[in-house]
Structure formats: structure tokens, C-alpha cells
């Protein structure tokens, strides 16, 4: 992903270095726009959003709703719209306290996705309904 501040870019690059030996994890530190963005979203099974700073609690929430709109389960920072993961079983709050903790969580998350595909699909359907354009318009017109 793209980063807004130099310290975020440094943290992103550190994550990429820490996980460089995992060939099935890819980090893209660039802006993805238009069709390139859509193709990237369609090419993955799940989306990880490791926004670690408190300032991102709602600032970058759009990425979470994009993941929901593309029916993608998520590993999201606990700071990122936490009420969404509390209401819908569409992913987990990511634990980046250490490489072993994250590795264990990632393995468990993948196993859970495989074993509970229908649960994730049902919850992604419900989240899409709750955050639909139709419901947005209805709430605006009230």
C-alpha cells in the first residue's frame, strides 16, 4: 500500500524486510489506481491492513470497506474501525507484536478461512448489506 507519512513508510518497509523469506506474502509499497487497483484486489484471497498508529482509527477506514465490497476477509489493525470486526466475522485484528505471534496468527487465520468459508461469506454478505449504497441513501434521507 501507499503510506502517508515517512514514519509509516519506514514501518511498512520494515514489515517487508521482516517477512521477505515468506514467498507467499507480497508487499506492494506503491499507489494502486484504477484498473491496477481492482486487479490487485481481485487477485488476493484476503487483505491485511497493518495500520499501527492510533491516528488511523477512522482515517483509513475506507480500505476496510473496500475489502468488504470486494468480499475479502481481512487481517486489520485493532485501531481500524474496530466495531466492524466486533459486529461481523469477516476477519481478525492483526497481532504484530512479534514475528512468531503474527506467523501463528496468520496460520490460524488461513486454517479458519479454509474451514469456515461459509461463515466468512455469510458475514461478508451481511456487512455488504449493512454498508450498502442503498442503506447509506436511506440513512441520509431520514
List the predicted regions and their residue ranges.
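Short beta-strand segments
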Residues: 1-2
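CheY-like receiver
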Residues: 40-43, 105-109
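Conserved beta-strand scaffold positions in the cores of enzyme catalytic domains, especially
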Residues: 27, 74, 91-93
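A charged, aromatic-enriched C-terminal amphipathic alpha-helix characteristic of glycosyltransferases
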Residues: 97-104, 111-142
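Nucleotide-sugar-dependent
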Residues: 49-65, 77-79, 83-84
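A short alpha->beta transition loop at the rim of the catalytic pocket in nucleotide-sugar-dependent
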Residues: 45, 71-73
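Nucleotide-activated donor-binding/catalytic signature segment of Leloir-type glycosyltransferases, i.e.
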Residues: 9-38, 43
Amino acid at each position: 500500500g501507499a503510506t502517508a507519512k515517512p514514519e509509516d513508510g519506514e514501518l511498512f518497509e520494515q514489515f517487508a524486510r521482516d517477512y521477505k523469506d515468506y514467498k507467499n506474502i507480497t508487499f506492494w509499497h506503491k499507489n494502486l489506481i484504477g484498473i491496477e487497483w481492482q486487479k490487485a484486489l481481485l487477485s488476493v484471497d484476503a487483505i491485511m491492513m497493518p495500520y499501527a498508529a492510533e491516528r488511523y482509527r477512522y482515517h483509513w477506514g475506507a480500505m476496510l470497506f473496500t475489502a468488504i465490497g470486494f468480499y475479502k476477509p481481512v487481517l486489520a489493525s485493532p485501531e481500524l474501525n474496530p466495531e466492524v470486526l466486533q459486529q461481523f466475522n469477516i476477519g481478525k485484528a492483526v497481532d504484530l507484536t512479534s514475528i512468531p505471534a503474527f506467523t501463528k496468527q496468520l496460520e490460524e487465520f488461513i486454517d479458519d478461512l479454509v474451514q469456515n468459508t461459509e461463515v466468512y461469506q455469510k458475514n461478508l454478505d451481511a456487512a455488504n448489506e449493512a454498508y450498502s449504497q442503498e442503506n447509506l441513501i436511506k440513512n441520509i434521507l431520514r
